Amino acid sequence: VRSRRQRQMWIRDSNNYIRQQIEKGFAAYIYDFKYPDLSIIAYNQLLKNKDKYAKPVGFYVINFDDPRYSHRCNPLNPSFLSDIADAYESAYVIMLNLNKSWIQKQGDFFVESPIVLFAAVIWYLKIYENGKFCTFPHAIELLNKPYSDLFTILTSYRELENYLSPFMDAWKGGAMEQLQGQIASAKIPLSRLISPALYWIMTGDDFTLDINNPEEPKVLCVGNNPDRQNIYSCALGLYNARIVKMVNRKGRLKCSILVDEVPTLYFKGLDTLIATARSNKVAVCLGAQDFSQLIRDYGDKEARVIQNTIGTVSY
């Protein structure tokens, strides 16, 4: 009974949180784990309060279950990738959302290898023909090409030649089992994301992710599905990482970040966002059934930092 009451209290709090923030003219990012529960509230509240925004406000949805009711957005837009480190960060978020056990094994050889390989693929798509094909689906498809063709293409670019030297050394040295293991560590998890709906949504540009742009404020709802969370959380984690970097800047509109059931995805940079974004008018609200879930999925150190940095905790 107690846990049920706690859950009901959380639902009421999150609903009221959304209502109050939109009433006050906040831009908003809402991670809706059981879509469309929170998204409906946000949409209806926005209809009543459009006059609270100085500029016309847009409402956008990412919905992998039914693309007919989804906007399209490319989280690997070339404009987001200024350096190969940005490609690495994207690959890092993707891989750790696909393999949450890796969160506590960061730095291990068989964790870093697939991240580095996928980062190289992303960066190649960024520099090839000015990023014409720089999307997450294109990266998955390129990675699944025969590795002899893949490495020949990637290492034809000088800036990727040194980046991939461990793979090339294994290839030229005849360590084929090691090489195939490294490649499979990237290919196998990503193969779960091969989906026409996901591909279509993640290759378009209906809107930009600067949700708190004073000239183009947005309320963005991204929907997960409890039955497919292991698939969708990976893609949604990439949107999260992009938004975190873009909203935490000075001179932006006040903004709300609401993450329902935060343990269900790896939200890179969440601890830093909580600690530093207040001065940039970013309000963060997290929901979880129990703190032990956060420890399980984020690791004890990162979970403790998040818990200790949060200003208010409601049970």
Regions picked out by a protein language model, each given a short descriptive name:
Residues 5-282, 298:
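P-loop NTPase motor domains
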